Regions:
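Elongated alpha-helical scaffolds that mediate protein-protein interactions in large eukaryotic proteins
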Residues: 1-23, 30-53, 64, 70, ...
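Eukaryotic scaffolding regions of large macromolecular assemblies
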Residues: 140-319
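Residues within HEAT/ARM-like alpha-solenoid scaffolds
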Residues: 3-7, 15-26, 40-43, 47-51, ...
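Extended amphipathic secondary-structure runs
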Residues: 83, 87-104, 180, 232-244, ...
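Amphipathic alpha-helical segments within extended alpha-helical solenoids and repeat-rich scaffolds
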Residues: 2-15, 45-67, 100-121, 152-173, ...
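Intrinsically disordered, low-complexity regulatory regions
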Residues: 256, 261-392
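Amphipathic alpha-helical interaction motifs in eukaryotic regulatory proteins
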Residues: 10, 25, 29, 53, ...
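Alpha-helical solenoid repeat architecture
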Residues: 1, 22-38, 79-96, 129-144, ...
Length: 392
């Protein structure tokens, strides 16, 4: 590139040769990390995006051509495809202003993604992972791209494929691999949901949010995709996946804190809402209530009519009340209640006393040793006023 051969390199990609595609794509891919490369010039003047889309379309032909027998793929075919996809991702990432130039590749990528078999042991190994990555930066808001991603004959076909990849991915990979491999799938699903027609959005909500069957147990304990996502939303060893899953579930809840609590339970929702400085329902029951404050009565009543689970769900755990296990315990005697009250009082005192010392420390320095002695006497007298044996 520094020698001025960028035009020749881009023209070389026109050749219907997997060897040329592999080598030239790899070379240009490596140069994208050099900030001195004029990517807009490569795309606008030397037709780099057009040539990449052409090569990807060539790879897609083998999946749409009717063949009596499926030929075994040439290893060079996949290697060249992977390099083209990696180059495409880097160009759309480092030069987002020209991401739209790669839109012609969208239908071909989707064909390959839906026709290729997905491994259960390594579902995001190349070329599946690079196919997903290549889709992330392509704008979906144009009419042609929406028609390609959500075809009228089967609007959910590509979403279902991504859901399948996601489910196999979170089952197959260890925690230390999830952030790198699975996060792009979640990011793409968020983008797809944002641009999808309403019927596709409803389908995604049905698949990715907990169902009534999931609520037969405490949310997150079933083996469905939705329950697995909930478990990973609190996994401390996968910070990127954890954050992306929570954000996706919040998006699926129409970015409404109340619906979010209804969908995933107060336990899973509270931490995410707090971290993002979003208003949290003051009471877990508020998310399911039908008689909130005067200003939200109409909304709560509407939610109650629209939600068949209203009044049937534990708002903290998300489990159906009728499926909760009842723990039968003998009622405490009066003496047991008093002993328990004393124990709690002692624990409370142990917690409060250090706070008293720290709070009054700033004033003691002005009152001198007499002030410190007086406060020490007050605290000690409170301790000894409790019953004998209460410190055990």
């Amino acid at each position: 590139m520094d020698l001025g051969y960028e035009q020749k390199a881009c023209n070389k990609l026109k050749n219907d040769s997997r060897d040329d595609e592999f080598l030239v794509s790899r070379i240009i891919f490596l140069t994208t990390y050099d900030s001195s490369i004029d990517m807009e010039k490569l795309i606008d003047q030397y037709h780099l995006a057009e040539n990449i889309c052409l090569n990807i379309s060539r790879h897609a032909k083998q999946f749409v051509t009717k063949q009596k027998k499926v030929k075994e793929l040439d290893p060079m075919e996949d290697m060249a495809l992977i390099e083209s996809l990696k180059l495409m991702f880097n160009l759309t990432h480092f030069c987002p202003e020209r991401a739209g130039a790669f839109s012609p590749a969208l239908p071909h990528i989707l064909v390959i993604l839906t026709k290729r078999a997905i491994s259960s042991s390594k579902p995001l190994d190349p070329p599946i992972g690079p196919l997903v990555n290549a889709l992330i930066n392509i704008p979906l808001d144009s009419k042609d791209n929406l028609a390609a991603f959500f075809p009228k004959a089967a609007p959910n076909i590509n979403v279902d494929r991504l859901d399948e990849i996601l489910e196999k991915g979170i089952k197959a990979y260890a925690d230390n691999e999830l952030d790198q491999l699975v996060s792009p799938v979640l990011t793409l699903l968020r983008k797809v949901y944002e641009n999808a027609p309403r019927e596709v959005q409803q389908h995604m909500q049905t698949v990715l949010l907990p169902s009534e069957a999931d609520r037969e147990k405490v949310l997150g304990r079933a083996e469905s995709l939705a329950s697995r996502l909930l478990r990973f939303s609190t996994n401390p060893s996968t910070p990127q996946v954890r954050e992306t899953i929570s954000t996706l579930l919040f998006d699926l809840s129409d970015k409404d804190a109340r619906k979010f609590v209804q969908n995933v339970g107060y336990g899973f929702a509270a931490g995410f809402l707090f971290q993002h400085n979003m208003p949290i329902p003051e009471n877990a029951l508020e998310a399911w209530s039908t008689s909130d404050s005067e200003g939200s009565n109409a909304r709560a009543s509407q939610d109650s009519r629209n939600n068949p689970l209203s009044g049937r769900v534990n708002p903290i755990t998300g489990q159906l009340l009728e499926k909760e296990e009842l723990i039968e315990e003998e009622e405490m005697t009066q003496e047991e209640k008093e002993r328990e009250a004393e124990r709690l009082f002692v624990l409370f005192e142990r917690f409060v006393i250090p706070i008293k010392w720290s709070c009054y420390g700033c004033s003691w320095q002005y009152k001198g040793w007499r002030g410190r002695a007086w406060w020490a006497w007050r605290i000690q007298s409170r301790r000894h006023s409790s019953r004998a044996g209460s410190w055990n």
